[in-house]
């Protein structure tokens, strides 16, 4: 009987996961994340040069980041723009160099375009969370400006801290020497999880539970790493874009990758937002099941002290159906 109940509980667990996936699918269709991802990809391409220009300007303001600018660029392009990172880096650096020579009006326009990207991300995520209360203009602008100015500083600080940790003599010990390559290999994954976690917890204008955001961040980071490797493999092994577009192949490659990246980001957000909805629904269903099951349990046992929990009732029902 105990083994049957354990099997029934496992069956209930997988059934719950299946129901959550169905709920997530309905949410994805309703929110049309493919259209949202296309919009964000378009805005991202428009804002790419302004964002890089503002980021490098912020890093240049701090002498501590002066020697690691090349490392930051290499890390970002290598891990976030697979297969076309080197080419894109050359073009973007050239564009940023031209943009930095512009007038005050031109630089202000670049900042506005960069803020447009942050605003589009904010609106898309709050729509996924069904947020009804909107931030005031002052609060929204302050948050956008903080992200635009402090974001590059935090990225630079994290890379400096990572370089410092890697250079510690403790990693030179024979017992820990094998850990260093593993740590370096997992570093992009850790940065991705941290970035997604921060995005899912801070951007929505409502309280988001840490575990829900962590689940969405881990799923998004795993999909991002798999997508990065898969997309790089496709571009290198099946160079159809280069055969069709020739020298302009970098443009569609970057656009497709940015679109896939936003699909992954929005999918992680949907998972995070769907978790409390599904758990609340399951909790209300369990309460209703327990209320209906108590009289049956009392009548069958003939003892008012014998009350089954909702989980036990669900497991027993599953066993009864299987028999």
Curated annotation (Swiss-Prot):
Pfam families associated with the record: Virul_fac_BrkB
Protein name: UPF0761 membrane protein Sbal223_0320
Topology of the protein relative to the lipid bilayer: Multi-pass membrane protein
Originating organism: Shewanella baltica (strain OS223)
Assigned GO CC terms: plasma membrane
Coiled coil: none
Cellular localization per UniProt: Cell inner membrane
Recorded family membership: Belongs to the UPF0761 family.
PANTHER family: INNER MEMBRANE PROTEIN YHJD, UPF0761 MEMBRANE PROTEIN YIHY
Keyword terms, alphabetized: Cell inner membrane, Cell membrane, Membrane, Transmembrane, Transmembrane helix
HAMAP family, A to Z: UPF0761
Transmembrane segments: 4-24, 45-65, 102-122, 137-157, 182-202, 213-233, 247-267
InterPro entries: UPF0761_bac (IPR023679), Virul_fac_BrkB (IPR017039)
Top-level taxon of origin: Bacteria
């Amino acid at each position: 009987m105990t083994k049957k109940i354990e099997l029934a509980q496992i069956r209930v667990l997988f059934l719950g996961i299946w129901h959550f996936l169905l709920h997530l699918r309905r949410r994805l269709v309703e929110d049309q994340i493919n259209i949202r991802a296309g919009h964000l990809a378009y805005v991202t391409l428009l804002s790419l040069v302004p964002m890089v220009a503002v980021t490098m300007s912020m890093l240049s303001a701090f002498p501590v980041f002066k020697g690691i600018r090349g490392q930051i660029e290499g890390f970002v392009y290598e891990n976030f723009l697979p297969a076309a990172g080197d080419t894109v880096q050359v073009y973007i650096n050239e564009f940023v160099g031209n943009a930095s020579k512009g007038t005050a009006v031109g630089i202000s326009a670049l900042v506005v375009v960069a803020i447009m990207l942050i605003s589009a991300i904010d609106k898309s995520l709050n729509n996924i969370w069904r947020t009804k209360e909107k931030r005031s203009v002052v609060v929204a602008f302050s948050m956008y400006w903080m992200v635009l100015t402090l974001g590059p500083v935090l990225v630079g600080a994290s890379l400096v801290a990572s370089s410092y940790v890697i250079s510690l003599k403790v990693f030179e010990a024979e017992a820990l020497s094998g850990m260093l390559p593993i740590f370096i290999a997992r570093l992009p994954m850790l940065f991705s999880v941290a970035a997604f976690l921060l995005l899912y917890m801070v951007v929505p204008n409502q309280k988001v539970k840490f575990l829900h955001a962590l689940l969405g961040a881990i799923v998004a980071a795993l999909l991002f790493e798999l997508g990065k490797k898969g997309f790089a493999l496709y571009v290198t092994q099946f160079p159809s874009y280069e055969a069709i577009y020739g020298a302009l192949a970098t443009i569609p490659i970057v656009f497709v990758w940015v679109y896939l990246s936003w699909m992954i980001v929005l999918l992680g957000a949907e998972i995070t937002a769907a978790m409390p909805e599904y758990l609340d629904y399951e909790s209300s269903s369990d309460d209703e099941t327990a209320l209906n099951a108590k009289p049956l349990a009392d009548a069958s046992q003939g003892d008012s002290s014998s009350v089954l929990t909702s989980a036990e009732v669900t497991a027993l029902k599953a066993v009864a159906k299987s028999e």
